[in-house]
């Protein structure tokens, strides 16, 4: 296993943000991505939830691919799915939304499983997934890929996701929380 963020010889404390930053560096150097997510230095916590949601929707509206970085603690186990941000962000990215004369279509969808703090991925098969995540894995619309595989060939996984997006009518895409 090789990842610049994980060494098999030492315990490495990383965050989802560190993986996002690594992905962005690599993707931008390859010229294949424009990032529309939250910046590391961006704090929206002082805003009302409605304002945050509007900002997220504006960013998601004209995007093409939704990457979801799956980590051991991405789901808050004692909160209902409908009270968590991640399923709503995924749902909005999959819905067709019209503003003025422009319609945003379903995004391509990739789930990237991050290694845990010990560099392992086995937690993923044991975790309870959001319904929208599980549904789009089961129907084949979203691909699940380990971080080390994804980061080694970003363009391949993006191309595969875009191909599935073109074939959207062939899938029963789960679009609701």
Please annotate each region the language model reported.
Residues 1-65, 104, 171-176:
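Conserved N-terminal substructure of TIR/SEFIR domains
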Residues 1-6, 115-177:
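C-terminal interaction surface of TIR/SEFIR-family domains
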Residues 7-12, 81-84, 124-127:
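Short, glycine/charged-enriched secondary-structure capping and boundary segments
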Residues 65, 90-91, 107:
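Residue-level detector of short, conserved catalytic/binding motifs and their immediate flanks
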Residues 68:
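Redox-cofactor binding/interface segments in oxidoreductases and associated redox assembly factors
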Residues 73-99:
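Conserved TIR/SEFIR loop-to-helix hotspot centered on a Trp-containing motif
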Residues 97-102, 141-145:
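Short C-terminal domain-edge/linker segments immediately following a structured domain
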């Amino acid at each position: 296993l090789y990842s610049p963020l994980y060494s098999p010889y030492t315990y490495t404390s990383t965050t989802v943000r560190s993986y996002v930053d690594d992905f962005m560096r690599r993707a931008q150097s390859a010229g294949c991505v424009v990032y529309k997510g939250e910046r590391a230095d961006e704090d929206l916590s002082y805003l009302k939830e409605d304002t945050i949601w509007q900002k997220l929707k504006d960013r998601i509206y004209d995007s093409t691919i939704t990457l979801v970085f799956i980590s051991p603690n991405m789901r808050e186990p004692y909160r209902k799915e409908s009270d968590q941000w991640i399923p709503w962000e995924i749902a909005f990215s999959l819905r067709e939304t019209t503003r003025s004369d422009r319609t945003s279509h379903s995004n391509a969808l990739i789930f990237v499983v991050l290694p845990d703090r010990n560099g392992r991925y086995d937690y993923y098969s044991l975790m309870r997934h959001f319904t929208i995540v599980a549904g789009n894995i089961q129907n084949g619309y979203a691909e699940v890929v380990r971080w080390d595989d994804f980061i080694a060939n970003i363009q391949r996984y993006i191309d595969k996701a875009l191909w599935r997006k073109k074939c959207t009518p062939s899938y029963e895409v789960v679009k609701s929380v």
